[in-house]
Amino acid sequence: MKINFAVKPAQMAKLTQEELLQIFRKVKSVMQPYEQGNIVAQMNIEGKYDLWSHKPGMVIMGKPRPAINFVTIIIQSGYVGFYYMPIYTQNPALVAKMPPALMKLLKGKACFHLKTMDDALLQDVATAMKAGYDAYKKMGWI
């Protein structure tokens, strides 16, 4: 009996552009309140939005830096990428505050692949935003 290894398992239907935009807009609405003071949007177009901290005198890993990325969202081909830079700090207290449902969506070091959005997941994103903001503030980056 031969087994055909070329047959691929059923794949999840690809999200439409409108579905991706809906997810993008909901996450952006949670990010926007943080755009104040030293935190500014460097890119703010339909499909990409990012927030950077421009605090004068920041020193990161022993080097002076004019800015550091806080969070970015980008519509990709099959998901909305939520790039959450505070997770790079390797701060155990920050990781402990991350909602488990959101952590399941982490792909790579700092990118969460958002393919659905409901009130619970949106609240998880809000929780992550607050925890990341607090961590950056504690490090003197905001």
Regions of interest found by a model, annotated:
Residues 1-142:
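Charge-dense, helix-prone N-terminal extensions
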